[in-house]
Amino acid sequence: MIRSHMLRERAERLLPGGVDSPVRAFRAVGGEPPFLVKAEGACLWDADGNQYLDYFGSWGPMILGHAFPPVIEAIQKQAAFSTSFGASTPSEGDLAELVVRAYPSMEKLRFVSSGTEATMSALRLARAYTKRKYIVKFDGCYHGHSDGLLAKAGSGLATFGIPGSAGVPEEIAQLTLTLPFNNLDAVEAAFAAHRNEIACIIVEPVAGNMGCVVPDEGYLQGLRELTRREGALLIFDEVMTGFRVAFGGVQELRQVRPDLTTLGKIVGGGMPCGAFGGPAEIMDLLAPLGPVYQAGTLSGNPLAMAAGMATVSHLESSKEWLYPQLEQMSAAVAQGVAEEAARAGIPLTTNRQGSMFTWFFTGQPVRDYATAESCDTRRFAQFHRGMLDHGVWLPPSQFEAAFLGVAHTMHHVEQTVTAAREVFAAMQS
Protein backbone atom coordinates (compact mmCIF):
# COMPACT_ATOMS: atom_id res chain seq x y z
CA MET A 1 0.00 0.00 0.00
CA ILE A 2 2.48 2.58 -1.24
CA ARG A 3 0.07 5.50 -1.53
CA SER A 4 -1.50 4.87 1.90
CA HIS A 5 1.99 4.64 3.43
CA MET A 6 2.95 8.02 1.97
CA LEU A 7 -0.30 9.56 3.18
CA ARG A 8 0.31 8.07 6.60
CA GLU A 9 3.78 9.60 6.83
CA ARG A 10 2.38 13.02 5.94
CA ALA A 11 -0.48 12.66 8.43
CA GLU A 12 1.91 11.78 11.26
CA ARG A 13 3.83 14.99 10.61
CA LEU A 14 0.68 17.09 10.83
CA LEU A 15 -1.84 15.29 13.07
CA PRO A 16 -1.22 13.78 16.54
CA GLY A 17 -0.76 10.07 15.88
CA GLY A 18 -1.65 10.72 12.26
CA VAL A 19 -5.39 10.66 13.01
CA ASP A 20 -8.32 12.79 14.15
CA SER A 21 -9.76 10.00 16.34
CA PRO A 22 -7.50 7.50 18.17
CA VAL A 23 -8.91 4.09 17.16
CA ARG A 24 -8.35 4.94 13.48
CA ALA A 25 -4.60 4.52 14.07
CA PHE A 26 -4.96 0.68 14.17
CA ARG A 27 -2.73 0.55 17.27
CA ALA A 28 -4.81 -2.28 18.76
CA VAL A 29 -4.59 -4.51 15.69
CA GLY A 30 -1.23 -3.61 14.18
CA GLY A 31 -0.28 -2.71 10.66
CA GLU A 32 -0.82 0.53 8.82
CA PRO A 33 -4.40 1.72 8.31
CA PRO A 34 -5.36 2.12 4.65
CA PHE A 35 -6.40 5.63 3.66
CA LEU A 36 -9.90 5.58 2.20
CA VAL A 37 -10.85 7.67 -0.82
CA LYS A 38 -14.21 6.30 -1.98
CA ALA A 39 -17.20 4.30 -0.78
CA GLU A 40 -20.36 3.05 -2.43
CA GLY A 41 -23.01 0.72 -1.09
CA ALA A 42 -21.30 -1.83 1.16
CA CYS A 43 -17.81 -1.29 -0.30
CA LEU A 44 -14.78 0.88 0.42
CA TRP A 45 -11.74 1.73 -1.71
CA ASP A 46 -8.36 2.88 -0.44
CA ALA A 47 -5.81 5.21 -1.99
CA ASP A 48 -4.03 2.25 -3.59
CA GLY A 49 -7.17 0.97 -5.33
CA ASN A 50 -7.86 -1.93 -2.94
CA GLN A 51 -11.54 -2.76 -2.36
CA TYR A 52 -13.03 -3.81 0.98
CA LEU A 53 -16.39 -5.05 2.23
CA ASP A 54 -17.43 -2.63 4.97
CA TYR A 55 -18.60 -3.79 8.40
CA PHE A 56 -17.94 -0.61 10.34
CA GLY A 57 -20.14 1.77 8.35
CA SER A 58 -18.35 4.93 9.49
CA TRP A 59 -18.92 3.68 13.08
CA GLY A 60 -22.64 3.22 12.51
CA PRO A 61 -24.29 5.97 10.44
CA MET A 62 -24.26 4.20 7.06
CA ILE A 63 -27.30 1.98 7.59
CA LEU A 64 -28.45 2.68 4.00
CA GLY A 65 -24.98 2.14 2.56
CA HIS A 66 -22.43 4.65 1.31
CA ALA A 67 -23.37 7.27 -1.28
CA PHE A 68 -27.07 6.37 -1.03
CA PRO A 69 -28.51 8.34 -3.98
CA PRO A 70 -31.38 10.14 -2.16
CA VAL A 71 -28.96 11.30 0.55
CA ILE A 72 -26.38 12.54 -1.96
CA GLU A 73 -29.09 14.33 -3.96
CA ALA A 74 -30.47 16.00 -0.82
CA ILE A 75 -27.01 17.27 0.17
CA GLN A 76 -26.25 18.55 -3.33
CA LYS A 77 -29.60 20.31 -3.57
CA GLN A 78 -29.14 22.06 -0.23
CA ALA A 79 -25.48 22.97 -0.91
CA ALA A 80 -26.59 24.97 -3.94
CA PHE A 81 -28.55 27.28 -1.61
CA SER A 82 -26.01 27.44 1.24
CA THR A 83 -23.95 25.16 3.45
CA SER A 84 -24.79 27.12 6.59
CA PHE A 85 -27.10 29.94 7.66
CA GLY A 86 -26.57 30.23 11.41
CA ALA A 87 -30.30 30.92 11.65
CA SER A 88 -33.56 28.98 11.82
CA THR A 89 -34.49 26.91 8.77
CA PRO A 90 -37.58 24.89 7.77
CA SER A 91 -35.52 21.69 7.62
CA GLU A 92 -34.95 21.69 11.39
CA GLY A 93 -38.69 21.37 11.98
CA ASP A 94 -39.05 18.81 9.20
CA LEU A 95 -36.47 16.46 10.73
CA ALA A 96 -37.67 17.14 14.28
CA GLU A 97 -41.19 16.00 13.31
CA LEU A 98 -39.77 12.73 11.98
CA VAL A 99 -37.70 12.15 15.11
CA VAL A 100 -40.63 12.83 17.45
CA ARG A 101 -42.77 10.35 15.50
CA ALA A 102 -40.10 7.69 15.95
CA TYR A 103 -39.37 8.54 19.61
CA PRO A 104 -42.56 9.51 21.48
CA SER A 105 -40.49 10.07 24.65
CA MET A 106 -39.02 13.14 22.91
CA GLU A 107 -41.77 15.77 22.97
CA LYS A 108 -39.18 18.40 22.14
CA LEU A 109 -35.59 18.12 20.97
CA ARG A 110 -32.59 20.21 20.10
CA PHE A 111 -30.11 19.51 17.32
CA VAL A 112 -26.37 19.76 17.93
CA SER A 113 -23.32 18.80 15.89
CA SER A 114 -22.21 15.56 17.56
CA GLY A 115 -23.15 12.79 19.95
CA THR A 116 -20.70 14.20 22.49
CA GLU A 117 -22.54 17.54 22.45
CA ALA A 118 -25.85 15.73 22.86
CA THR A 119 -24.82 13.75 25.95
CA MET A 120 -22.96 16.69 27.49
CA SER A 121 -26.03 18.90 27.09
CA ALA A 122 -28.40 16.21 28.39
CA LEU A 123 -26.35 15.89 31.58
CA ARG A 124 -26.40 19.66 32.14
CA LEU A 125 -30.16 19.63 31.67
CA ALA A 126 -30.61 16.70 34.08
CA ARG A 127 -28.58 18.43 36.77
CA ALA A 128 -30.56 21.64 36.36
CA TYR A 129 -33.91 19.85 36.45
CA THR A 130 -33.14 17.73 39.53
CA LYS A 131 -30.88 20.29 41.26
CA ARG A 132 -28.46 17.44 41.98
CA LYS A 133 -24.82 17.00 41.00
CA TYR A 134 -23.89 13.28 40.79
CA ILE A 135 -24.37 11.17 37.68
CA VAL A 136 -24.27 7.39 37.26
CA LYS A 137 -22.72 5.75 34.21
CA PHE A 138 -21.51 2.22 33.56
CA ASP A 139 -18.12 0.62 33.00
CA GLY A 140 -17.39 0.33 29.29
CA CYS A 141 -20.21 2.62 28.18
CA TYR A 142 -18.91 5.53 26.10
CA HIS A 143 -20.89 8.75 25.92
CA GLY A 144 -18.46 11.03 24.13
CA HIS A 145 -15.33 12.78 25.31
CA SER A 146 -16.66 15.47 27.66
CA ASP A 147 -14.80 15.59 30.98
CA GLY A 148 -17.45 14.09 33.23
CA LEU A 149 -18.05 11.05 31.03
CA LEU A 150 -14.53 9.73 30.45
CA ALA A 151 -14.33 7.63 33.63
CA LYS A 152 -13.97 3.93 32.75
CA ALA A 153 -15.43 4.61 29.32
CA GLY A 154 -15.32 2.17 26.43
CA SER A 155 -14.41 2.87 22.81
CA GLY A 156 -10.85 4.18 22.41
CA LEU A 157 -10.20 4.16 26.16
CA ALA A 158 -10.94 0.44 26.25
CA THR A 159 -8.93 -0.12 23.07
CA PHE A 160 -5.83 1.45 24.61
CA GLY A 161 -6.43 0.11 28.14
CA ILE A 162 -6.82 3.59 29.65
CA PRO A 163 -9.11 3.92 32.73
CA GLY A 164 -9.74 7.62 32.13
CA SER A 165 -8.19 10.70 30.55
CA ALA A 166 -5.45 13.01 31.71
CA GLY A 167 -6.60 16.60 31.96
CA VAL A 168 -9.86 15.81 33.76
CA PRO A 169 -9.82 17.48 37.21
CA GLU A 170 -10.38 15.11 40.10
CA GLU A 171 -13.22 17.31 41.33
CA ILE A 172 -15.14 16.64 38.10
CA ALA A 173 -14.35 12.92 37.98
CA GLN A 174 -15.61 12.49 41.55
CA LEU A 175 -19.10 13.52 40.48
CA THR A 176 -19.35 10.52 38.13
CA LEU A 177 -20.26 7.23 39.80
CA THR A 178 -19.18 4.39 37.51
CA LEU A 179 -20.87 1.04 38.08
CA PRO A 180 -20.83 -2.41 36.42
CA PHE A 181 -23.26 -2.83 33.51
CA ASN A 182 -26.13 -5.33 33.96
CA ASN A 183 -25.93 -5.11 37.77
CA LEU A 184 -29.00 -3.58 39.42
CA ASP A 185 -27.72 -4.31 42.94
CA ALA A 186 -24.78 -1.95 42.34
CA VAL A 187 -27.19 0.78 41.25
CA GLU A 188 -29.33 0.27 44.35
CA ALA A 189 -26.21 0.58 46.51
CA ALA A 190 -25.14 3.80 44.78
CA PHE A 191 -28.52 5.43 45.39
CA ALA A 192 -28.42 4.30 49.02
CA ALA A 193 -24.97 5.86 49.47
CA HIS A 194 -25.91 9.11 47.72
CA ARG A 195 -29.52 9.63 48.75
CA ASN A 196 -31.08 12.65 46.99
CA GLU A 197 -27.76 13.50 45.31
CA ILE A 198 -27.90 11.59 42.00
CA ALA A 199 -29.24 13.64 39.11
CA CYS A 200 -29.42 10.90 36.50
CA ILE A 201 -28.37 7.57 35.12
CA ILE A 202 -26.96 7.66 31.59
CA VAL A 203 -26.70 4.33 29.79
CA GLU A 204 -26.18 2.87 26.36
CA PRO A 205 -29.33 0.69 26.41
CA VAL A 206 -27.44 -1.73 24.19
CA ALA A 207 -23.75 -1.10 24.73
CA GLY A 208 -21.62 -0.77 21.63
CA ASN A 209 -18.40 0.71 22.91
CA MET A 210 -17.12 -2.30 24.83
CA GLY A 211 -18.20 -4.34 21.86
CA CYS A 212 -21.88 -5.15 21.56
CA VAL A 213 -23.26 -6.05 25.00
CA VAL A 214 -26.99 -6.63 25.35
CA PRO A 215 -28.89 -5.76 28.55
CA ASP A 216 -30.19 -8.63 30.65
CA GLU A 217 -33.93 -9.15 30.62
CA GLY A 218 -35.46 -6.66 33.05
CA TYR A 219 -32.29 -4.57 33.47
CA LEU A 220 -33.50 -1.46 31.65
CA GLN A 221 -36.91 -1.69 33.30
CA GLY A 222 -35.11 -1.96 36.64
CA LEU A 223 -33.20 1.24 35.93
CA ARG A 224 -36.47 2.93 34.98
CA GLU A 225 -38.14 1.90 38.24
CA LEU A 226 -35.13 2.89 40.35
CA THR A 227 -34.83 6.37 38.86
CA ARG A 228 -38.56 7.04 39.24
CA ARG A 229 -38.44 5.96 42.87
CA GLU A 230 -35.37 8.06 43.63
CA GLY A 231 -36.36 11.21 41.73
CA ALA A 232 -33.51 10.92 39.23
CA LEU A 233 -33.71 11.06 35.43
CA LEU A 234 -33.00 8.15 33.11
CA ILE A 235 -31.05 9.05 29.97
CA PHE A 236 -30.82 6.60 27.09
CA ASP A 237 -27.76 7.28 24.97
CA GLU A 238 -29.09 6.02 21.64
CA VAL A 239 -26.40 7.73 19.57
CA MET A 240 -25.42 4.29 18.25
CA THR A 241 -28.67 2.34 18.61
CA GLY A 242 -31.09 5.05 17.48
CA PHE A 243 -32.73 4.11 14.14
CA ARG A 244 -30.28 1.16 14.09
CA VAL A 245 -31.71 -1.72 16.14
CA ALA A 246 -35.26 -0.56 15.36
CA PHE A 247 -36.77 2.59 13.90
CA GLY A 248 -37.61 3.71 17.45
CA GLY A 249 -34.36 2.41 18.93
CA VAL A 250 -33.97 0.26 22.03
CA GLN A 251 -36.80 2.07 23.79
CA GLU A 252 -39.16 0.73 21.13
CA LEU A 253 -37.71 -2.79 21.32
CA ARG A 254 -37.71 -3.04 25.11
CA GLN A 255 -40.73 -0.81 25.75
CA VAL A 256 -38.89 1.32 28.31
CA ARG A 257 -39.47 5.08 28.15
CA PRO A 258 -36.50 7.21 29.30
CA ASP A 259 -36.72 10.81 30.48
CA LEU A 260 -34.11 12.04 28.00
CA THR A 261 -32.72 10.51 24.81
CA THR A 262 -29.57 11.36 22.90
CA LEU A 263 -29.17 10.62 19.20
CA GLY A 264 -26.37 10.89 16.64
CA LYS A 265 -24.86 8.97 13.73
CA ILE A 266 -27.91 7.87 11.67
CA VAL A 267 -30.03 10.92 12.54
CA GLY A 268 -27.64 13.07 10.49
CA GLY A 269 -27.33 10.66 7.58
CA GLY A 270 -23.54 10.57 7.91
CA MET A 271 -23.13 14.32 8.41
CA PRO A 272 -21.98 15.83 11.75
CA CYS A 273 -25.20 15.85 13.78
CA GLY A 274 -26.62 14.93 17.15
CA ALA A 275 -29.82 15.57 19.06
CA PHE A 276 -31.18 15.35 22.59
CA GLY A 277 -34.76 15.51 23.71
CA GLY A 278 -37.46 14.63 26.18
CA PRO A 279 -40.63 16.01 27.78
CA ALA A 280 -41.40 19.69 27.23
CA GLU A 281 -41.27 20.26 30.99
CA ILE A 282 -37.56 19.38 30.97
CA MET A 283 -36.57 20.67 27.54
CA ASP A 284 -38.10 24.10 28.17
CA LEU A 285 -35.38 24.71 30.77
CA LEU A 286 -33.08 25.37 27.81
CA ALA A 287 -32.31 28.95 26.78
CA PRO A 288 -33.96 31.05 25.48
CA LEU A 289 -36.91 29.78 27.55
CA GLY A 290 -34.99 28.75 30.66
CA PRO A 291 -31.71 29.09 32.57
CA VAL A 292 -29.80 26.16 31.01
CA TYR A 293 -27.46 27.50 28.36
CA GLN A 294 -26.57 25.52 25.24
CA ALA A 295 -25.66 26.86 21.81
CA GLY A 296 -23.79 26.02 18.63
CA THR A 297 -22.85 27.85 15.43
CA LEU A 298 -23.53 24.79 13.27
CA SER A 299 -26.42 23.29 15.27
CA GLY A 300 -29.19 22.35 12.85
CA ASN A 301 -26.78 22.79 9.93
CA PRO A 302 -28.84 22.60 6.71
CA LEU A 303 -26.59 19.97 5.09
CA ALA A 304 -26.96 17.69 8.12
CA MET A 305 -30.71 18.32 8.22
CA ALA A 306 -31.02 17.47 4.52
CA ALA A 307 -29.01 14.25 4.88
CA GLY A 308 -30.92 13.34 8.04
CA MET A 309 -34.29 13.93 6.40
CA ALA A 310 -33.37 11.78 3.39
CA THR A 311 -32.11 8.98 5.64
CA VAL A 312 -34.78 8.94 8.34
CA SER A 313 -37.69 9.39 5.91
CA HIS A 314 -36.44 6.40 3.91
CA LEU A 315 -36.14 4.33 7.08
CA GLU A 316 -39.66 5.31 8.10
CA SER A 317 -41.24 4.47 4.74
CA SER A 318 -39.30 1.20 4.45
CA LYS A 319 -39.26 -0.01 8.06
CA GLU A 320 -41.72 -2.88 7.53
CA TRP A 321 -39.25 -4.71 5.25
CA LEU A 322 -35.94 -2.97 5.95
CA TYR A 323 -35.44 -3.97 9.59
CA PRO A 324 -36.44 -7.63 9.02
CA GLN A 325 -33.95 -7.72 6.13
CA LEU A 326 -31.21 -6.31 8.35
CA GLU A 327 -32.07 -8.90 10.99
CA GLN A 328 -31.85 -11.75 8.48
CA MET A 329 -28.51 -10.64 7.00
CA SER A 330 -26.98 -9.86 10.39
CA ALA A 331 -28.01 -13.21 11.84
CA ALA A 332 -26.55 -14.99 8.82
CA VAL A 333 -23.14 -13.34 8.97
CA ALA A 334 -22.85 -13.46 12.77
CA GLN A 335 -23.81 -17.14 12.92
CA GLY A 336 -21.79 -18.07 9.84
CA VAL A 337 -18.53 -16.69 11.22
CA ALA A 338 -19.23 -18.22 14.64
CA GLU A 339 -19.70 -21.65 13.05
CA GLU A 340 -16.38 -21.34 11.22
CA ALA A 341 -14.65 -20.44 14.49
CA ALA A 342 -16.17 -23.50 16.15
CA ARG A 343 -14.96 -25.75 13.32
CA ALA A 344 -11.46 -24.33 13.74
CA GLY A 345 -11.56 -24.85 17.51
CA ILE A 346 -11.26 -21.13 18.24
CA PRO A 347 -13.29 -19.90 21.24
CA LEU A 348 -15.70 -17.21 20.08
CA THR A 349 -18.75 -15.59 21.65
CA THR A 350 -21.14 -13.67 19.41
CA ASN A 351 -23.24 -10.83 20.83
CA ARG A 352 -25.79 -9.19 18.58
CA GLN A 353 -28.76 -6.85 18.64
CA GLY A 354 -30.24 -6.40 15.20
CA SER A 355 -27.60 -5.16 12.77
CA MET A 356 -24.93 -4.37 15.38
CA PHE A 357 -22.76 -7.21 16.64
CA THR A 358 -19.37 -8.26 18.00
CA TRP A 359 -17.33 -11.44 17.77
CA PHE A 360 -15.58 -11.69 21.15
CA PHE A 361 -12.55 -13.96 21.26
CA THR A 362 -13.55 -15.84 24.39
CA GLY A 363 -15.51 -18.96 25.20
CA GLN A 364 -17.37 -17.23 28.02
CA PRO A 365 -20.54 -15.11 27.88
CA VAL A 366 -19.88 -11.36 27.63
CA ARG A 367 -22.39 -9.29 29.60
CA ASP A 368 -20.33 -6.44 31.07
CA TYR A 369 -17.00 -4.66 30.76
CA ALA A 370 -15.13 -7.11 33.00
CA THR A 371 -16.04 -10.07 30.80
CA ALA A 372 -15.34 -8.06 27.64
CA GLU A 373 -11.88 -7.15 28.97
CA SER A 374 -11.08 -10.84 29.50
CA CYS A 375 -11.20 -11.52 25.74
CA ASP A 376 -8.10 -12.51 23.79
CA THR A 377 -7.28 -9.22 22.09
CA ARG A 378 -4.16 -10.72 20.50
CA ARG A 379 -6.32 -13.21 18.63
CA PHE A 380 -8.75 -10.49 17.65
CA ALA A 381 -5.85 -8.52 16.17
CA GLN A 382 -4.81 -11.59 14.13
CA PHE A 383 -8.37 -12.01 12.93
CA HIS A 384 -8.72 -8.35 12.02
CA ARG A 385 -5.49 -8.29 10.00
CA GLY A 386 -6.40 -11.53 8.25
CA MET A 387 -9.88 -10.33 7.33
CA LEU A 388 -8.48 -7.03 6.04
CA ASP A 389 -6.05 -8.98 3.85
CA HIS A 390 -9.10 -10.86 2.52
CA GLY A 391 -10.88 -7.60 1.71
CA VAL A 392 -13.18 -7.43 4.75
CA TRP A 393 -12.97 -4.26 6.87
CA LEU A 394 -13.99 -4.73 10.53
CA PRO A 395 -13.75 -2.16 13.34
CA PRO A 396 -10.07 -2.08 14.41
CA SER A 397 -10.77 -2.91 18.06
CA GLN A 398 -12.24 -5.82 19.99
CA PHE A 399 -14.22 -3.19 21.89
CA GLU A 400 -16.14 -1.63 18.99
CA ALA A 401 -19.36 -3.01 17.52
CA ALA A 402 -19.57 -4.01 13.87
CA PHE A 403 -22.49 -2.91 11.68
CA LEU A 404 -24.34 -4.19 8.65
CA GLY A 405 -26.52 -2.12 6.30
CA VAL A 406 -29.18 -2.62 3.67
CA ALA A 407 -26.54 -2.54 0.92
CA HIS A 408 -25.14 -5.85 2.17
CA THR A 409 -26.34 -8.93 0.29
CA MET A 410 -26.21 -12.68 0.83
CA HIS A 411 -23.27 -12.72 -1.56
CA HIS A 412 -21.45 -10.38 0.81
CA VAL A 413 -22.34 -12.64 3.74
CA GLU A 414 -20.95 -15.68 1.91
CA GLN A 415 -17.80 -13.73 1.01
CA THR A 416 -17.33 -12.81 4.68
CA VAL A 417 -17.87 -16.35 5.98
CA THR A 418 -15.45 -17.77 3.40
CA ALA A 419 -12.83 -15.20 4.37
CA ALA A 420 -13.30 -16.05 8.05
CA ARG A 421 -12.86 -19.76 7.32
CA GLU A 422 -9.52 -19.10 5.63
CA VAL A 423 -8.37 -16.68 8.33
CA PHE A 424 -9.26 -19.06 11.16
CA ALA A 425 -7.35 -21.84 9.39
CA ALA A 426 -4.29 -19.60 9.11
CA MET A 427 -4.57 -18.64 12.79
CA GLN A 428 -4.44 -22.33 13.74
CA SER A 429 -1.38 -23.12 11.62
From Swiss-Prot:
<dbReference type="GO" id="GO:0008483">
    <property type="term" value="F:transaminase activity"/>
</dbReference>
<protein>
    <recommendedName>
        <fullName>Glutamate-1-semialdehyde 2,1-aminomutase</fullName>
        <ecNumber>5.4.3.8</ecNumber>
    </recommendedName>
</protein>
<dbReference type="InterPro" id="IPR015422">
    <property type="entry name" value="PyrdxlP-dep_Trfase_small"/>
</dbReference>
<keyword id="KW-0663">Pyridoxal phosphate</keyword>
<dbReference type="InterPro" id="IPR004639">
    <property type="entry name" value="4pyrrol_synth_GluAld_NH2Trfase"/>
</dbReference>
<dbReference type="GO" id="GO:0005737">
    <property type="term" value="C:cytoplasm"/>
</dbReference>
<feature type="modified residue" description="N6-(pyridoxal phosphate)lysine">
    <location>
        <position position="265"/>
    </location>
</feature>
<keyword id="KW-0413">Isomerase</keyword>
<comment type="subunit">
    <text>Homodimer.</text>
</comment>
<dbReference type="Pfam" id="PF00202">
    <property type="entry name" value="Aminotran_3"/>
</dbReference>
<comment type="similarity">
    <text>Belongs to the class-III pyridoxal-phosphate-dependent aminotransferase family. HemL subfamily.</text>
</comment>
<keyword id="KW-0627">Porphyrin biosynthesis</keyword>
<dbReference type="GO" id="GO:0042286">
    <property type="term" value="F:glutamate-1-semialdehyde 2,1-aminomutase activity"/>
</dbReference>
<dbReference type="InterPro" id="IPR049704">
    <property type="entry name" value="Aminotrans_3_PPA_site"/>
</dbReference>
<dbReference type="InterPro" id="IPR005814">
    <property type="entry name" value="Aminotrans_3"/>
</dbReference>
<keyword id="KW-0963">Cytoplasm</keyword>
<dbReference type="InterPro" id="IPR015421">
    <property type="entry name" value="PyrdxlP-dep_Trfase_major"/>
</dbReference>
<comment type="pathway">
    <text>Porphyrin-containing compound metabolism; protoporphyrin-IX biosynthesis; 5-aminolevulinate from L-glutamyl-tRNA(Glu): step 2/2.</text>
</comment>
<dbReference type="InterPro" id="IPR015424">
    <property type="entry name" value="PyrdxlP-dep_Trfase"/>
</dbReference>
<dbReference type="GO" id="GO:0030170">
    <property type="term" value="F:pyridoxal phosphate binding"/>
</dbReference>
<dbReference type="GO" id="GO:0006782">
    <property type="term" value="P:protoporphyrinogen IX biosynthetic process"/>
</dbReference>
